[in-house]
Amino acid sequence: MSSSHGYRASWWTYILHQVPHTNFQFEVVDNQFAPQEWPYQQALLFLASIAGLCLAISLILICVYLIRFCCCSSQEDDDSKSHRVCCVTWSCVAAVIICCAGIGIGFYGNSETNDGVYQVTYSLMNANHTLTSINLLISDTVELLSSVVRSDLTQLEEIFSKRTEFLVMIRNTRRQVESVAQQLAEISFWKGPEPNPNALAEQVNFIEDYRWLAYILLLLLDLIICLFTLLGLAKQIKWLVIVMTVVSFFVLLLSWGSMGLEMATAVGLSDFCSDPDAYVMNQTQAITNINPDILQYYISCNQDVTNPFRQRLTMSQRALSNIHSQLHGLEREAVPQFPTAEKNLLVVQGMLNTTEGNFHHLVALLNCRGLHKDYVDALKGLCYDGMEGILFLLLFSFLSALSFTAAICSLPRAWKRFQNRDLDYDDMDEDDPFNPQESKRFVQWQSSI
């Protein structure tokens, strides 16, 4: 489980993480998240192939039912046919209602997944902003210190060249300034390698936009099929029901296919979310070559992990204090004797004030709480909202596949019964919800009131 403060793997993550991981040779594979390794990829593909097996079973059931329908329908008596027509019609209606319920679940799951991915991209952009701010603050401060060393401190050395005690103080100040610049330059741990957090956020957002749109189109397609199927049954439009039956067959393939993809994604995501710290550390270090101590500091952010920048920050703080003391002594003792040095000392003092302000801002940015919060928010978005959304999408695909399987089996019998609806209605069951005679009686009864 993750040791990150503020994140704990959910119970559904734990359950999915315990799903057996088996490769194509039916050998058990380690469930540690390793998408770059072929055995782990085989395990996810094996899970996805379960949906393919379900598709094959549903196709066999459909074929068996249709063969039985074509061969045995003529042998049924009138009472049996009438009763079966009513059952078939209600079966179609029930399948459509279940499919509509699944569509509602799918819309919710798609929205939850999108919210989770949006939280991930937002956290990545925040982290990128923090890292960029650290680099800019360090580079600006180092440039400011270097410019003061090249100009004002060099001029002060020339002014105090004949006074050894003042010259020693200026040279000590120069060494302290150079030391601060060196310490700050070594703190900059993120050199902006690709992919940086912002580039990763853009890539994730790009993929999510197309994923969200694809599911919206699939959900709308399912909804349109359900509505037109109900319309065809209610109006007894044979050609419309036939078209919806054919389209339902293709959507059945999409439903089982999406279910396989969602099943593999859910299990893979649970493997990552059960222990994200190790994978994030290994991948980040492999890509960026950042010191492992720095990564551990920001990922864990607890009292057991020491701040890797503490020594450099402490040395820089002491150097700034020494510079302040030396400048105060020069202003008190040297300015009365060398009035021309006052302007340069004021410039150096302004540099010191600016550097101290930047230093305190840098200390706040380097604190682990900011980047760790972004890290935890990204984990929560991916492993809470994202995982929940994928599970709801998985349920949608399953309900949709079952509904379309039932509809494909039921609709042929339904359209066969109302193909001659204009000829005779006497053999239709009165309990049929779409009986035209019953509809006419209801209209006549309303008009007589």
Swiss-Prot record:
Function: May act as a calcium-independent, swelling-dependent volume-regulated anion channel (VRAC-swell) which plays a pivotal role in the process of regulatory volume decrease (RVD) in the brain through the efflux of anions like chloride and organic osmolytes like glutamate.
UniProt source species: Xenopus tropicalis
Protein's membrane topology: Multi-pass membrane protein
Pfam family, one: Tweety
Quaternary assembly: Homotetramer; disulfide-linked. Homodimer.
Cytoplasmic topological segments: 65-86, 234-238, 410-449
Site location (Essential for the formation of the channel-pore): 163
PANTHER family: PROTEIN TWEETY HOMOLOG 1 (PTHR12424:SF5), TWEETY-RELATED (PTHR12424)
Extracellular side: 1-43, 108-212, 260-388
GO cellular component, one term: plasma membrane
GO biological process, one term: L-glutamate transmembrane transport
Family membership noted in the UniProt record: Belongs to the tweety family.
Glycosylation sites: 128, 282, 353
Bilayer-crossing regions: 44-64, 87-107, 213-233, 239-259, 389-409
Gene: ttyh1
Keywords: Cell membrane, Chloride, Chloride channel, Disulfide bond, Glycoprotein, Ion channel, Ion transport, Membrane, Transmembrane, Transmembrane helix, Transport
Cystine pairings recorded for this chain: 273-383, 301-368
Catalytic function, reaction form: chloride(in) = chloride(out); L-glutamate(out) = L-glutamate(in)
GO molecular function: volume-sensitive chloride channel activity
Cell location: Cell membrane
Annotated protein name in UniProt: Protein tweety homolog 1
